[in-house]
Amino acid sequence: SEHWQLFNNNEVLFNEARTAQAATVVFSLQQNAQIEPLARSIHTLRRQRGSAMKILVRENTASLRATDERLLLACGANMVIPWNAPLSRCLTMIESVQGQKFSRYVPEDITTLLSMTQPLKLRGFQKWDVFCNAVNNMMNNPLLPAHGKGVLVALRPVPGIRVEQALTLCRPNRTGDIMTIGGNRLVLFLSCLLYTS
């Protein structure tokens, strides 16, 4: 369409959007590592460009947790389009925000939002004491919803497989997913995951 413009990446899109007023901006989310930089870009645009701009995030692979989505929305995104939405649904969702004004409050300081929604900065194998301390801190964080702090899973390997061997099969790619070994079990903590997920 003559009304659409495609950009090479989110950074180029962000720089172009900094001069727009009531444009519709659709960021692309490819991987979990993009969440914080994308949140910062969204926060900046919303604070600088105001409520007429429509800011959407199109998730291209399953990489968002509920807290990640809450962060993007709290930073000023109008909507997050899930990775499994077909193109026709995606276009309908983009169309649905046209004419809307963003009405939610966006705090001036993004660090409050980041610390509230992304409190655990660890990933992968942790020593037992570090693991226990991290899980305890998450469970006692009053800023996270009670049902969304995380899920703790203890796995016992099948006979003939040592727990250390099972550990080599775990490759978490999300910050906040940690694991340890204890009591001949592989213990995983998937942070900020809803029980229903």
Residue locations for each model-derived region?
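Catalytic-site or vestigial catalytic-site microsegments of nucleotide-handling domains
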Residues: 133-162, 184
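CheY-like receiver
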Residues: 102-141, 147
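Alpha4 helix (beta4-alpha4-beta5 surface) of REC/receiver domains from two-component response regulators
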Residues: 62-78
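C-terminal output helix
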Residues: 85-93
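Short beta-strand->loop micro-motif that forms the acidic, two-metal-ion catalytic signature
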Residues: 181-192
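A short, well-structured beta->alpha microelement
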Residues: 2-21, 32-35, 133-138
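Conserved phosphotransfer microenvironments
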Residues: 17-49, 58
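Conserved small/polar residues in nucleotide/adenosyl-binding loops
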Residues: 195-196
